[in-house]
Each structure stands twice: as structure tokens, then as C-alpha cells.
């Protein structure tokens, strides 16, 4: 049935002949590339884009995808949960988007809340990918879904219970239930036993507790950098919290009621501090530049195993028949011009069906920007060094992220660009916090000087004080 669909029916618009796929996470690209070439006609143009979970929002806003594969880790971090929610919200705008969720075996049965159309447990085999493609071509490529009535056995059900589907699918997904329940390739099984449910609940509880402790640890590390340096002060969590309480009390006493009202209003307007917690914005490392060699790596092995996709880049794949049986071909990435309006530079390639080759890349390491005198003063008496982990994958793996004009705070050609080698990481958050408190003290001092006579000098703090 699937191979009868013409090129005009592929994608979201008739006659488009193009399929856009997004792989979020460390997806199994070998199976996907081989399945794309096998199941789609030779005239179909396939665009594969690989990205991490941090750039899902940017990619969804700038592009329209047909199939999105989200592969999560065994810990199911907050960033991955946020990416799943973004993809789910994107399905409301693009009804022809298929969301495939690839989860570890230990998390099987606990993905219904993320609204995935199809969920698979690892490993992601070629058979599972083919099932996803067949399902998308059957139910997501109709260009006039609003005016077309599906047969009764394939209607869309929005209120199917979890127990009926073995807890593998969402209750509000686009689902042809009769077909899916009779399709053994989807791996639908009976509901989990009470022992398995208990193990899964215990694992999820420990995962949430681990995330909570990581949040506490991250906040304490930020407090250590924001607090004034005191020689001999303990650095454990309890001591840092106690020192923070004392410091906040001193700051509140030094601020005028008008400024305190402004601070209170700003905190109340911040949705992060509301009862309904928003996802934490985790640290996004700066992009890194890379250098390309002119040499090429050629091979005559299986085309499925030789296709290597670049991190955060796209590949346009054309299925072609090798002329004369010669085992030659090339996958040559062409870097796009960097501009402020560009969001993702796509590498477009022509891929023959018999051989592949890939340009080699140098491994790069993260660098940082210069430290201004103002920021250096904010770090006075502090001996803190910050290092970003180097990224040095092999040629056959993903390369580090490239410097992008939209993601880099400065132009790549500027000497102040944070992606330029030879600079240090700027402690912007620490300097900004110090400048805020200094601004509060200055404003408070001006209010008191205008309305009150000069006050007596304040007594010096005792030796036992933290400050």
C-alpha cells in the first residue's frame, strides 16, 4: 500500500515531493537513512536535520517538519521534557506532523503524558522505523483531511484509554486504533504487571529526586559566586544558605521601601517563581567554531552504514541509481553563508545509492570571551576558574556545533566573539548580580541623603559574622 503513493502525495502539499525529518537527540541515523531510501520513491527529496534538545524551539519556529524523532536518555531530563512539550504544541499548528518517541526500555509505559503519536523502546531497529514511515504515509499525507471522511475502522479516536492500548500511546493523539491494535510491528503488549509498575514508579521517583538534587546543587553553586567573599567561610550547602539569609537581611535593611516594592513586584511578575513551576533554563554552552580539511574519506561499504549526518545540520538526500555500477560517490557538505537572519545552515548533498564519502573535521574545544575591568572587579578576592568540557569526537561521529550568527552573542569575525579561540569565559551573571546590588545601595543612599541628616558611622561587623 505504501509504495503506491505517488510523489505528489508526499509531504503536506500536493506535488511537493519533499519530506522534512527532524532527529532530536542521538538518533540512530543509519536505520533512518536506509529506510528513507527504501520506502520513498527515487524522485522524493528527503531533508534530514539533527539537533539537540536545546534548539528544538528555534527549529520548530523556523521550519515545518513531517516526522520528528525524539530520543531521550534514561534520566529523562527537564530539557527533554520541555522538548516533548514543544513538539506536542507544534502538532496543533501542523496537523500532518508525526511525533515518534524513542525511549529507553526502563521508561516503557510512562510516555503518555507527552502526546507522542508512536513510541518505541530501544533499540530503534530498521523494522520500527519502517513502521513509522508506513504509518505516516498512510494517515498523515492526506492533503485534504478536513474534507475527507475516513472509513469507520480507521477513524481518529481521541478518548482511547491507556489500558486499551497497553499504556504506550497518548489519550489525545491522532490514532487509527483498530489498525494499530492489530499491527504486531508496533509492539503493543499487555498492561504491565503490578511488580513492573512498582519498579517503574520507584525508578521515576528516584529520577525526579535526582533532578531535584541537581537543581539544589546548581542554585548553591550560583549562591557561592554571588555572595561576597569571606576568608575561611565554609562552602557546604547549609553554610551557604545561612550566609545567604544573613546577606539578604543586610540588603533589605539597606534598601528603601520604594525600591523593595519594585523588587517585590518584579519577583511576583516572574512566572518562574509562581506555584506552577516553569522548566529551568539550563546552562547553554557557547557555540564553537571548526575547521574543515580538503581531504575526503571515501569508502565502498554499505550506503546505510556510510551516511554520516552532521550535528545541527540538514542533508538533502536523493535516491539515485549508480551509472555503470561504479562504486563512487561523495557527500560533500557545502557551508552556507552566515547571516543574522539565518537560523540553521543546511548542508545539502546528493547521495548515490552505492557509495558514500564524508569530509573530515578537526576536533575543537570551547573557548570564552575577554573579561572587562568591571567584571574583574566583581570577582575580586575570588579564585574561581570555569572550564567548558572539550568536544573531540571521531570523524565518524557528530562534530561540535558551529558558531552561528543567531546563537553567538557577537559576530564570528569580531575579536570579542565568545567563539573566538584565546578568550576567557565572561562571568556575566556574577557581574550583573553585583551591579544590581550596587545600584540598590546607591539609590537607597541618595534617598536617605535627601531626606535625613548625616548618620553616624555604622559599627564594624564582628569577627564571627559572615561578612
From Swiss-Prot:
Classification via CDD domains: bHLH_SOHLH1_2
Protein name in the entry: Spermatogenesis- and oogenesis-specific basic helix-loop-helix-containing protein 2
Induction of expression: Up-regulated in mice lacking Sohlh1.
Keyword DNA-binding: yes
SMART domains: HLH (SM00353)
Loss of function: phenotype: Knockout mice are infertile. Infertility could not be rescued by SOHLH1 or SOHLH2 transgene expression due to a lack of expression of either genes in rescued animals.
Signal peptide: none
Region ranges (Disordered): 443-467
Keyword annotations from UniProtKB, A to Z: Cytoplasm, Developmental protein, Differentiation, DNA-binding, Nucleus, Oogenesis, Spermatogenesis, Transcription, Transcription regulation
Subcellular location: Nucleus; Cytoplasm
Species for this entry: Mus musculus
Function description: Transcription regulator of both male and female germline differentiation. Suppresses genes involved in spermatogonial stem cells maintenance, and induces genes important for spermatogonial differentiation. Coordinates oocyte differentiation without affecting meiosis I.
Sample GO molecular function, one term: identical protein binding
Annotated ranges, domain bHLH: 200-251
Biased composition range(s): Low complexity: 443-453
Assembly with partners or alone: Forms both hetero- and homodimers with SOHLH1.
Keyword Zinc belongs to the record: no
One Gene Ontology cellular component: cytoplasm
Tissues of expression: Preferentially expressed in the adult ovary and testis. Expressed in the majority of spermatogonia in adult animals, but not in the most undifferentiated spermatogonial population.
GO BP field: cell differentiation; oocyte differentiation; positive regulation of transcription by RNA polymerase II; primary ovarian follicle growth; regulation of gene expression; spermatogenesis
Amino acid at each position: 500500500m505504501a509504495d503506491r503513493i505517488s510523489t505528489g502525495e508526499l509531504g503536506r502539499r500536493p506535488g511537493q515531493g519533499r519530506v522534512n525529518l527532524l532527529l532530536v537527540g542521538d538518533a540512530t541515523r543509519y536505520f533512518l537513512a536506509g529506510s528513507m531510501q527504501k520506502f520513498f520513491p527515487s524522485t522524493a527529496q528527503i531533508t534530514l536535520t539533527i539537533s539537540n534538545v536545546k534548539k528544538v524551539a528555534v527549529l520548530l519556529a523556523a521550519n515545518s517538519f513531517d516526522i520528528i524523532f525524539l530520543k531521550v536518555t534514561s534520566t529523562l531530563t527537564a530539557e527533554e521534557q520541555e522538548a516533548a512539550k514543544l513538539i506536542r504544541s507544534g502538532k496543533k499548528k501542523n496537523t500532518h506532523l508525526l511525533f515518534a518517541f524513542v525511549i529507553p526500555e526502563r521508561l516503557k509505559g510512562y510516555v503518555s503524558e507527552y502526546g507522542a503519536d508512536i513510541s518505541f523502546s530501544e533499540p530503534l531497529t530498521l523494522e520500527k522505523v519502517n513502521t513509522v514511515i508506513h504509518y505516516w504515509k498512510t494517515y498523515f499525507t492526506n492533503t485534504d483531511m478536513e474534507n475527507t471522511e475516513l472509513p469507520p475502522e480507521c477513524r481518529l479516536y481521541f478518548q482511547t484509554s491507556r489500558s486499551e492500548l497497553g499504556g504506550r500511546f497518548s489519550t489525545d493523539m491522532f490514532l487509527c486504533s483498530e489498525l494499530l491494535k492489530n499491527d504486531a510491528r508496533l509492539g503493543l503488549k499487555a498492561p504491565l504487571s503490578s511488580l513492573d509498575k512498582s519498579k517503574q514508579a520507584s525508578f521515576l521517583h528516584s529520577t525526579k529526586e535526582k533532578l531535584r538534587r541537581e537543581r539544589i546543587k546548581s542554585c548553591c553553586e550560583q549562591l557561592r559566586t554571588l555572595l561576597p567573599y569571606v576568608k575561611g567561610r565554609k562552602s557546604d550547602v547549609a553554610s551557604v544558605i545561612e550566609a545567604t539569609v544573613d546577606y539578604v537581611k543586610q540588603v533589605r535593611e539597606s534598601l528603601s521601601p520604594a525600591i523593595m516594592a519594585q523588587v517585590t513586584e518584579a519577583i511576583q511578575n516572574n512566572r518562574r517563581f509562581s506555584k506552577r513551576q516553569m522548566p529551568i533554563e539550563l546552562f547553554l554552552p557557547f557555540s564553537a567554531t571548526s575547521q574543515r580539511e580538503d581531504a575526503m574519506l571515501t569508502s565502498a561499504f554499505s550506503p546505510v552504514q556510510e551516511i554520516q549526518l552532521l550535528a545541527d545540520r540538514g542533508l538533502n538526500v536523493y535516491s539515485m541509481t549508480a551509472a555503470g555500477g561504479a562504486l563512487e560517490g561523495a557527500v560533500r557538505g557545502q557551508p552556507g553563508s552566515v547571516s543574522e537572519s539565518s537560523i540553521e545552515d543546511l548542508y545539502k548533498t546528493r547521495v548515490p545509492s552505492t557509495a558514500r564519502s564524508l569530509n573530515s573535521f578537526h576536533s575543537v574545544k570551547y573557548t570564552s570571551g575577554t573579561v572587562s575591568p568591571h567584571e574583574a572587579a566583581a570577582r575580586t578576592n575570588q579564585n574561581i576558574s570555569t572550564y567548558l568540557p572539550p568536544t573531540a569526537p571521531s570523524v565518524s561521529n557528530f562534530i561540535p556545533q558551529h558558531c552561528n550568527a543567531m546563537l553567538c552573542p557577537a559576530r564570528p569575525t569580531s575579536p570579542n566573539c565568545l567563539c573566538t579561540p584565546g578568550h576567557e569565559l565572561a562571568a556575566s551573571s556574577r557581574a550583573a548580580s553585583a551591579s544590581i546590588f550596587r545600584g540598590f545601595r546607591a539609590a537607597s543612599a541618595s534617598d536617605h541623603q535627601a531626606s535625613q541628616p548625616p548618620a553616624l558611622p555604622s559599627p564594624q561587623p564582628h569577627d564571627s559574622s559572615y561578612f
